Amino acid sequence: MSNAWQDVSQVYGGCSFFAAWGEATGSGGMLVGRNLDYAGLEQLAGFQSINFYKPETGYRFVTVNYPSMVGIMHGMNEKGIVIAKAYSTVVPEETTVDGVPFTIMLRHALQYGGSVDEVVNIIKNTPRTVGLNILVADAARREAVVLEVSAYRMTVRREDSARANFIYSANRFLTPYLKEYQEPGWLSSAFREARFEKLKQAFSSELKVEDAVRILRDKEVEDPDSPALLPSIQNNATISSMVFDPVRLELWVSAPGGLLTTDQVFTGISASEVWRTGQPPSPVGFIPATETTPVVRAWQQVMTAAGASDQRKKELLTPVVERYPAAGYPLYLLGVACLRTGELQAGLGYLEQCVISANLPDPYYLLAAHAWLGVAYDTLGRREQALQHYRAGLAVELWEEVDPMVLQICQ
């Protein structure tokens, strides 16, 4: 069950990944960055390990994994193939438990796939279970694609241009074919995709491992004096981060421990040296921890608060919004926490501040704040104010299909 519970329960996490190659890396190499966003595994995150496999058949491979798991969610083999997955929720008709658990499928693909085409064929011919975005990168061909799959459908997404050298994914399908079968849900995919687009331009040439780590650590802090302090490529569910260099057969991994470890030291390891010598790995280098500036410290505090109790949210977020009164996401979290604990006036104040004057780049939170304000004003018998917020919520232009509950409240 350790390798099938995600398929059976259909409990979805987040995750982001990207691959860059050719001119994007300056040296003509290839780098793959991957954030594992899965707060449900946080208790296991402290037991994170780097596992090297030398199977009797197939290719040797390496993965970052957790106790009892023999399948993989990401990894690299000796042929320079890298695989990483991200959930992409699909309608119930496109899922089944009558298939191979996806972690076992991905292990099989990594163990026996020596090229993009071979991996694609393995996944195509494997009975699948759930919706996924699967990155497949091939160092030999300097090529990377994203497989968008459900239990019964599959398509291969490539970059549009023949000169393209950067591809990414979050938790939604981008091809028209699979979009038709997407289950509405909100995991900030569009926002993270927008961040990848911006960072792709910022690191348009000579991308190095250090730069790949900076992308994985992205917090959307464009203006340190007026930050939004909201989840980005790194977020409150990120429990592990890694960069694969399949040309050199190296991987760089964040420290074990779970939440916020992406900001800790990354350790570089040569898989080729382990496979050559059969000896335990020695670090080939380190990437320093994120500099803890005031805005980084505030962002980390907000991410910690996001998964905390309402009382703890209030303790953590009150000083943050005092220092950054235009930071929309902590205002939203604090306002909701106050409403839930019976502090209606305080909650209304924070949420009104959130919708009127806050920096809130992801429009979903604006919709949600209006919905909460409508419910709160209805609770107080102030129907006209409630209706104003319901209407304002319905007028928000969303970037992606969201969980219908918040929209239904406004409707």
List where the protein language model places each region:
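C-terminus-biased signal that marks the final domain/tail of proteins
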Residues: 1-14, 110, 114-144, 152-154, ...
